[in-house]
């Protein structure tokens, strides 16, 4: 556990390859804790792998559904941009003022019922 690993370029083969070499020497390249972590009973991975194998058929059937969803997400986005542009052109043609900027008539204090 006291080993320190370094990534050194492997000059013997291609210049782009890197090898992890321990400082303890070539004999300690495969420490025993690595074998303990990766050596598992073969029955455990087989049981885990058989359960997800039943899932790909539904995933394959969902693949054609993904194409209409992409088009559907683009439609509201494109429609949402047009009303904002129309509103800008309409408000620009209207005369400037606090009452004219609102699309609905402003309430005046005279319309409130008196007790």
From Swiss-Prot:
Residues 60-70, 91-107 have a biased composition (Low complexity). Residues 7-17 have a biased composition (Polar residues). It comes from Human adenovirus C serotype 2. This is Uncharacterized protein E-115. Residues 1-115 are annotated as: Disordered. It comes from the Viruses.
């Amino acid at each position: 556990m006291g080993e320190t690993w370094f990534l050194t370029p492997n000059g013997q083969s291609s210049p782009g390859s890197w090898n992890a070499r321990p400082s303890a020497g070539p004999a300690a390249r495969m420490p025993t804790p690595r074998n303990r972590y990766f050596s598992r009973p073969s029955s455990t991975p087989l049981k885990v792998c058989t359960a997800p194998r039943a899932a790909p058929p539904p995933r394959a059937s969902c693949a054609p559904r993904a194409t209409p969803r992409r088009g559907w997400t683009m439609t509201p986005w494109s429609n949402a941009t047009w009303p904002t542009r129309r509103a800008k052109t309409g408000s620009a043609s209207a005369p400037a003022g606090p009452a004219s900027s609102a699309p609905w008539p402003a309430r005046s204090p005279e319309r409130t019922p008196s007790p």
